[in-house]
A protein has these predicted regions:
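Bacterial N-terminal signal peptides that target proteins for export
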Residues: 2-10
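Bacterial N-terminal signal peptides
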Residues: 10-19
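Extracytoplasmic/secretory-pathway proteins
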Residues: 22-188, 193-381
Length: 381
């Protein structure tokens, strides 16, 4: 049987029971996740570490408790880049100190206007720091209490500051590394400015001349944020899908930024995208729609090697497991093994359909994570 026919058959097996499952879900009572459920299927073991962590299934809270703002995500990478650029002209620990220590901003300004460092690359580094550290009160959000939702008053940069940085970027012609960093700061400052939407045309005009490194996709994330602020969700979702597909370290963040739309709109949007970005788009759509199996199968029809099926498959298994473990969760007496097997049979045939999974598990070697498919198939068998 060909791969396409197998996936098509899996679709049929899934949809044949969809009505029953939807009815039981709509009429059932799903209590808050106040109790910890023991799991025999740990997604962080079967899926590459850190790639989808907070997108794994949890009923009332994020997987592993919460999602923090990982402000240190790029700290070491950015430090390494600047150390390589500056070379031996400035010690590594001084570079780290100037980039990240809270009280270093005054020192940056003093060094910038002194004659201690005459090396051109060090001067560029100090110019970069003058921009980033000089505006971090606003770009870093340190001026408000993140837990005070009632009295949050966002500050914005005056338009003159991003315009100044943009002018500096446009004047740079010979130093690609420095120009790329200043370009990113221009994008960033426009996002935090009084004219946030100005980041969109600037990115569209200049992005093609930039290397597609982490700064490129971080800049794209700001543009997606500007579209979200304008409620232009289709445009935002396209950018978020590209980031989700290309930048694993941002998948959790963009997954939460995504705004689900009706499937017909997503299908229209997806037609113009590359297969990888289409898969990412459907993966995020599946995260929000409570029907992981359907979107998982959509992805497999586009690219059977797509890694984005992985967190959807783990969510499907963990949701089913949550229904199976009612005895464990609430301390209900398990009157007999037979009663448990009857309950498990009902969950796996009426509340959830698993025939499609068993079918695809036999073909697991053809997918991106054969181990996950075999373990999932064995779990529901």
């Amino acid at each position: 049987m060909t791969q396409k026919r197998i996936i098509k058959l899996a679709f049929c097996l899934l949809t044949s029971i969809a009505g029953i499952g939807a009815y039981l879900y709509a009429c059932g009572w799903f209590p808050p996740d106040w109790y910890v459920t023991n799991s025999a299927f740990s997604p962080e073991v079967t899926v590459p570490k850190g790639v989808y962590n907070s997108l794994f299934y949890s009923v009332e809270q994020s997987f592993n408790g919460y999602v923090g703002i990982d402000s240190d995500r790029y700290t070491e990478d950015d430090l390494a880049d600047w150390c390589a650029y500056v070379g031996k002209a400035m010690p590594r620990e001084q570079i780290r100190h100037l980039m990240y220590d809270g009280e270093a901003i005054d020192e940056v300004l003093q060094l910038k206007h002194s004659k201690k460092f005459t090396d051109k690359r060090v001067q560029n580094f100090l110019t970069f720091l003058e921009i980033t550290r000089g505006n971090e009160v606003i770009t870093g959000g340190s001026y408000y209490d993140p837990w005070d939702y009632e009295n949050r008053n966002y500050q914005r940069l005056q338009n003159t500051e991003p315009q100044r940085v943009e002018a500096l970027y446009r004047s740079l012609t010979s130093d690609a590394f420095f120009a790329n960093r200043i370009w990113f700061q221009a994008v960033r400052l426009k996002f935090y400015s009084e004219n946030r939407s100005s980041v969109i045309p600037f990115f569209e005009e200049t992005a093609a001349s930039q290397p597609k490194n982490s700064l490129y996709y971080r800049a794209m994330h700001y543009v997606a944020g500007a579209y979200i602020a304008e409620k232009h969700y289709p445009q935002a979702n396209v950018l978020l899908a590209e980031i989700f597909d290309t930048t694993p370290e941002l998948r959790t963040t963009v997954g939460y930024d995504y705004r689900p739309l009706p499937d017909r709109e997503i299908a229209q949007i997806a037609q113009k995208l590359s297969p990888g970005v289409q898969c990412a788009l459907w993966a995020m759509q599946g995260f929000y729609t409570n029907n992981e199996a359907n979107y998982l199968l959509k992805i497999l029809t586009i690219d059977r090697q797509s890694p984005h099926v992985e967190f959807l498959l783990t969510r499907f298994i963990n949701k089913m497991e949550y229904k199976l473990n009612v005895f464990d969760r609430y301390g209900d007496d398990l009157k007999s093994i037979k009663a448990y097997h009857q309950h498990a049979r009902k969950v796996s045939t009426q509340v959830f359909s698993t025939d499609w999974l068993l079918l695809l598990a036999r073909e697991g070697n053809r997918f991106s994570n054969p181990y996950l498919w075999k373990v999932a198939g064995g779990y529901v068998a």
